[in-house]
Every structure is written in C-alpha cells, then in structure tokens.
C-alpha cells in the first residue's frame, strides 16, 4: 500500500515537473518572441532615424554648396563694383575739370551756387516732410483709436436678444383657454383692462399670446396669468388680486435687475432709486435693443477704453451705465431723456463729472473730458453694431406711445392702453369727472384728435370705459 502511494506521488511529481517545464518553455518562447519584436521595432526606428539624418545631411550639403556658390557670386560682384567705383572716380574728376573750363567757375564757386539751390530745395522738402509727419501722426492716432476700440469690443462680448412685442404663456391643456376667457368673455376683458395687454387666444395648441408694446405691462400680464393658471381659480376678483401681486413682483424684479447691473459693471454706491430705475431699463427698448443691456455694454466699453487711454475707468463706467437713465421715466415726465437723466442724477447727488459725461452722448452738450468722449463713443459703438437695433419696431412702438399720449393728456383720464397692434385704444376715465352721457362726447373728441395728429392705416377703435364701484363692509 505504501509503495502504491509512493508510486502515485512519484507520478504526480513527474507530471507536475513536466507541466512546470512546459510552462517555463512557453514563457521563454513568449519572452523570446517579444524581445525579437521589440528588437525589430527598435531596429526599424533606428533605420528611420538614420534615413532622416542622412536626408538632413544631404540637405545641409546642398545648402552649403548653394551658399558657397552665392559667396563666390557676391565676391565677383564686389570686385566688379570696386573696379567700377574707380572708373567712376576718374570720370568724375574729368567731368569736374571740363565743367570748370566751360563755366569759368572753380569747384568752390560751383559748390556755393549748388548749396544755395539745395538750400531752397531742402526747405521745400522740409515743409513737405512736416506735412507728411502731421498726416502720419493723424493716421497713427486713428489707427491707435481703432485698436483701442477693437480691443474694447473684443473684451466686451455682450449678447443681445432683439426684443419683440409678444410673450407666449404655455397652458397645461387647451381647456384652460375657456376658463381664461370666462363666461361671456368677462375674465379676458378684466385681464386686458387691468394690464393694458391683448390676450390672443387662437388655434395655437396649449398657448396664449400676450401682445403689447410696453414690456413692463406685458411682464405683469405674464406673471398674473401664470399665477392664475397655477392657482386654478380664475374670476374677475381673483384676476385683480393676481395683477396686484404681479405688479409688486415686477417691482422686486426691477430692483434685482438694477442691482445685478451694478454688480456686473462694478459700479457701486448708487442711490437705491437709481438702481430701481436701472432695473426699469430692462423693460425698455430703443430700436429693438434692450436699453439695460445696452447701458451695461456701454459701461464696459467706456471703462475698457478709459483704461487703455489712461483715463478714469470708474468714472467712464459709471457714466456709461447711467447714460440712458432718463429713458426709464421719459414717457412719464416731459423733456428729452438726456434732460430727464441730468435732473435725476442731480437729484440723487451724482458728481458733476458723471452728469457731464452722461449729458454729452447725443451731442446736446460739448464734451469737456475724455470720459465724456469715451461714453459717446461707447454709445455709438453699441448702437451701431450690426443687428443691435431695428428701426421698424421702434417706429411701431413710438406710434403706440403717441396714441396713448393723446388720451393721457386729457384731464380725467386714469390710464390708457393701446392694444390690437394700435387698432384700438382703451381709455379708463375717472367716474367723478365724466358721467355716462359725457363719455360718448369724450370718445368723439379723442377720435377727432387722433385723426388730426396721427397717420395710420385702416381705422382705430376708441373704447372709453367708466367704472363705478361701491364698497361697504358688513360688521
């Protein structure tokens, strides 16, 4: 039994030994193949390097040969030039001698005569040179100015989105359209009357279009409508409540936008009311260009150019940011936006330098500081950039604003809204000023005024609304 176990163990040992030897041979064979492969690759690489070196050597030999040939040619040309120089000297001396004999002048006398003529010529050339230097200086100044402006524009890569006159509000389903319209249209009429915005409800799936030229009113209408949709309760009283909430929310947005603008431009220490007015510029457009984004861009451009020219970048940025501040209220106060802006800056204690730099950007006043010139230039650059402004939208908005101004100039008008793309104006009058009979005559008077003062296609509907409310509380 012990012998059998021993024999089995010997056999197993022999088998294991053979397996180990076989694995070792395979590993050796594998390593040998890998070594040969690496050796071949290295030999190939060395051959490639050797070929490249040989090619470079041949190239250098050719270049060396070419340089030697050029050197020989230059040496020959130099010798030829030296020979010709000697010949020219001989000819020159002979010609001088002949000229002295023919003219009866010595070389000294001829030299003095020549110097006199040369002096006149040099004076003329000097005058021309001064003129050329002046022209070159102007060209260099123009070039430097273009470089500074280009650098400022490249550093200030502001994005602009062309503003439109419509906003789309998404609905959860098309059934919501009926609830927004309300029984006999009372909900939609209430919302349009309170906001001054047209609600266009058509076949567009799950969407209502808000149309109006005043972006602030449109934003109030959007927020109010979205709140009503989310709340689910849509009736005139709830609409009034949501419109009031939306107005407060928009006021908060104005403040946040103004603060963000001062943060983005690095302009600090502004009066809170100026910050709020800056926020209002987010909802103002000039030829389709967002006025707040335009003001931020002007601030950046003016600051960058001031830095390049060694002027005061903080002053330039501050004046650039505030240069259109008058546009935040120019439809509420009489005067140009520059006059209004100057009055606002004086009211809120801005420095004379800031007011001056802001006041000159349309050429109403002569710029007296480099910062004022830079604000004017930055304003022109921002406005002139291709695609920044659209004339047709601006003229359309101005026509609607003029339509509202006609109504607002009458006493007893609480507010007015130009809607339906200017085809209708809704005028809400104070009930204590006009009675029910008088509003018909008032509507007729407004109609005649519009016909006299405005040019418009088609016809304009004048809708005068008089509303009386009696409120008591049961205790």
Swiss-Prot record:
InterPro entries: HD/PDEase_dom (IPR003607), HD_domain (IPR006674), HDIG_dom (IPR006675), KH_dom (IPR004087), KH_dom_type_1 (IPR004088), KH_dom_type_1_sf (IPR036612), Ribonuclease_Y (IPR017705), RNase_Y_N (IPR022711). CDD domains: HDc, KH-I_RNaseY. Its EC number is 3.1.-.-. GO terms for biological process: mRNA catabolic process. Residues 291-384 form the HD domain. PROSITE patterns: HD, KH_TYPE_1. Keywords: Endonuclease, Hydrolase, Nuclease, RNA-binding. SMART domains: HDc, KH. One of its GO terms (molecular function) is RNA endonuclease activity. It holds the Pfam family HD. The keyword RNA-binding applies. Residues 34-73 are annotated as: Disordered. Residues 165-228 form the KH domain. GO terms for cellular component: plasma membrane. The keyword Nuclease applies. Belongs to the RNase Y family. Endoribonuclease that initiates mRNA decay. This is Ribonuclease Y. It comes from Alkaliphilus metalliredigens (strain QYMF).
């Amino acid at each position: 039994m012990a012998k059998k176990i021993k024999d089995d163990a010997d056999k197993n040992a022999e088998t294991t030994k053979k397996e180990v030897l076989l694995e070792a041979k395979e590993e050796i064979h594998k390593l040998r193949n890998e070594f040969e492969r690496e050796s071949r690759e290295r030999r190939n690489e060395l051959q490639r390097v050797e070929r490249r070196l040989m090619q470079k050597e041949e190239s250098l030999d050719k270049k060396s040969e070419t340089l030697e040939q050029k050197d020989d040619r230059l040496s020959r040309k130099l010798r030829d030039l030296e020979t010709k120089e000697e010949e020219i000297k001989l000819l020159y001396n002979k010609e001088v001698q002949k000229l002295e004999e023919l003219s009866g002048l010595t070389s000294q006398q001829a030299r003095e005569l020549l110097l006199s003529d040369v002096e006149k010529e040099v004076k003329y050339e000097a005058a021309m040179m001064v003129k050329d230097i002046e022209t070159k200086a102007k060209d260099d100044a123009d070039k430097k100015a273009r470089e500074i402006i280009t650098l400022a524009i490249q550093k200030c890569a502001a994005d602009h989105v062309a503003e439109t006159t419509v906003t789309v509000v998404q609905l959860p389903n098309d059934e919501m359209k009926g609830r927004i319209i309300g029984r006999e249209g009372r909900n939609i009429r209430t919302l349009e009357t309170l906001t001054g915005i047209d609600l266009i409800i058509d076949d567009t799936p799950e969407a209502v279009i808000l149309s109006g030229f005043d972006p602030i009113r449109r934003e109030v209408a959007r927020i109010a409508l979205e709140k009503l949709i989310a709340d689910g309760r849509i009736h005139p009283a709830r609409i009034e409540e949501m419109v009031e909430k939306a107005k407060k929310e928009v006021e908060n947005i104005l403040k946040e936008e103004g603060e963000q603008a001062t943060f983005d431009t690095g302009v600090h220490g502004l009066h809170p009311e100026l910050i709020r007015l800056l926020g209002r510029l987010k909802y103002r457009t000039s030829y389709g260009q967002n006025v707040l984004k335009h003001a931020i861009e002007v601030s950046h451009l003016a600051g960058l150019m001031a830095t390049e020219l060694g002027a005061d970048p903080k002053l330039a940025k501050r004046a650039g940011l505030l240069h259109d501040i008058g546009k935040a209220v120019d439809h509420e106060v009489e005067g140009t936006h520059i006059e209004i802006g100057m009055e606002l800056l004086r009211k809120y204690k801005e420095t004379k330098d800031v007011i001056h730099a802001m006041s000159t950007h349309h050429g109403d006043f002569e710029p007296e500081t480099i910062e004022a010139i830079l604000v004017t230039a930055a304003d022109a650059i921002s406005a002139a950039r291709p695609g920044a402004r659209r004339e047709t939208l601006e003229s359309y908005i101005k026509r609607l604003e003029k339509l509202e101004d006609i109504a607002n100039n009458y006493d007893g008008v609480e507010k007015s809204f130009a809607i339906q793309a200017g085809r209708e104006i809704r005028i809400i009058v104070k009930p204590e000023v006009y009675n029910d009979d008088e509003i018909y005559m008032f509507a007729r008077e407004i109609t005649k005024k519009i016909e006299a003062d405005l040019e418009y296609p088609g016809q304009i509907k004048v809708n005068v609304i008089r509303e009386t409310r009696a409120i008591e509380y049961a205790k």
